[in-house]
């Protein structure tokens, strides 16, 4: 589509809104301009959603517990409030981990204070204290506790910090209070920030004076990889094959001990910039640890990132980097040769969180799939700054897109594939459009590194599945047949 066509499409879709809402939403929709250095000149982001519009965003609690803290496997994360929030954020993303669930790993379990009406009236501090005591008795191998506040906790003013300090001293364990009530901020993005700040204040400096850990010149951490489908494991294999030592993964398959040791590494490798840039910036300022954003989606971007990482180290690492790329090159070239012919020329629209709308573009390009629209649910303008240059001219950009807008854009652009979240999945599948869930890889994966065969296979089996040709209702077929008979008469 040309720039004029995209601008016309945006105006058509916005016509149904009242004038005030139409003017506000127009700021969040734009054709892409790769020449721009600052995205704020074309699109507005990280603003409060308009009341009455069906936003697809999540809340601060989801950003903290569901994204940052939840995958830390050897801690118990208490969802402090009514039971529903904890249950809805439990085991939904496929954060893989090594350990025995319920013994020394707790990622897929739901620990809740199960707030009731009486707790709202009388407060929940005593209940929280009792819950921590029970955890100490029942789960002796856990290494720490986090308290993830839900909305009622902030509304009634419970002092979870005081409870955390008291119980941490009493049980000689780490107890981290996280003020991530869902009403805070405009999206789950503030939950990421709050979670990062809680790690900074309650965890990160615990081993600053500990000299027992032997460091090497090749120590790195993987930050912002949540090990969905085993992503962090695939990334770790490549980094270790090129001679680096991965000290910590944040937070997929991660531990509290790894987090405490991270200030001792030489380089922080940041995959999901949006959710983990805050703690990475803090470590850069306090400990002098440089951070580097990298992209392990698709073989082209993976090879580029490996070479960029190697530039931070000596010639031995650079040489091993080239050996690693050469080792896997024939494999990924064979995969692309197999799948690209059936995917070439297909078009995809994306709407995800704060990373994937730009990071997966290269993976689709490797397979010959064209991006025709993308947007962030909780991205900031620095995310869009990085996105503009990855996309073609006049590609449709949409920020905090509403359910109505997304459906209308899809109807008019008619993409071959949509990549978004679980809330959108069934709407578009019922419209007969192939869909991939890009928050959990539809419980597949890994997608990171040179495991390109899994990504390619999933796109191929979705796009070229014969079921899409069988979705026409019988009465619609009858109408078509009648029209053909009438036309031939």
Curated annotation (Swiss-Prot):
GO terms for biological process, alphabetical: nitrogen fixation
List of residues binding [7Fe-Mo-9S-C-homocitryl] cluster: 272, 439
Cofactor binding annotation: Binds 1 [8Fe-7S] cluster per heterodimer. Binds 1 [7Fe-Mo-9S-C-homocitryl] cluster per subunit.
GO molecular function: ATP binding; iron-sulfur cluster binding; metal ion binding; nitrogenase activity
Keyword Nucleotide-binding listed: yes
EC number: 1.18.6.1
Claim: Lipid biosynthesis is one of the keywords in the record: no
UniProt-listed SUPFAM superfamilies: Helical backbone' metal receptor
Annotated GO CC locations: molybdenum-iron nitrogenase complex
Its biological purpose: This molybdenum-iron protein is part of the nitrogenase complex that catalyzes the key enzymatic reactions in nitrogen fixation.
UniProt record similarity statement: Belongs to the NifD/NifK/NifE/NifN family.
Protein name as catalogued: Nitrogenase molybdenum-iron protein alpha chain
Organism: Alcaligenes faecalis
Gene that encodes the chain: nifD
